[in-house]
Amino acid sequence: MNLAIEAPRVSLSRGDSYGAGDLYLQPINLGWNTKHADVIAWYGLFGPTGRYAPGANNNRGLGMWSHELALGSTVYFDDKKTLHASALGAYELHSQKKDSDVRVGQLLTIEGGLGTTLKQALNVGMAYYLQWKLTEDSGLGLPPLVENRLGKNRNFGLGPEVSMALPLSKDFSKLMVLTFRYLWETGTRVDTKGNILAFSLTFKVH
């Protein structure tokens, strides 16, 4: 994990560190299902358990507590649920960073996609994300690169996504889901910019 570049502190130095990062807990996760829509809501907490020192180039964590509130839904356009669209909004609030006066601004992230299901196991479509920093970063000792352009960052991304469900039991009650996503970023303001390639592996065991 390379955290030489982190928000809101931007560093041009390089450094790699290997080990456990910050802890993420989701003590509240609620879901509702209807014939043509699924809804989910949760509260998540990021804890600063990864090693962090202000200005270091080998940090494994971000050195701050973060609270996450999220609400999302998937809407199905036919009875067989083969055509669907989704959107998930998450709001993040952050504490001051460890041993520092720096506080990262509050973030709003919206992500989702539009897709279709083929042969019950393969999903293909387009994914997107939108992210805005709604309040300015604050604190002492910010580098000159950003000290006059604090906060109000934004990033947008759009690209293809493919996922495949592989059954681990005959009745499909246990699944392994492989997901591939590639996003082109655009509309970036006061932030680093680059395309995103992501793979994920999810297990459903009940």
List each model region and its residues.
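Outer-membrane pore/translocation modules
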Residues: M1-V104, R149-N153, F203-H206
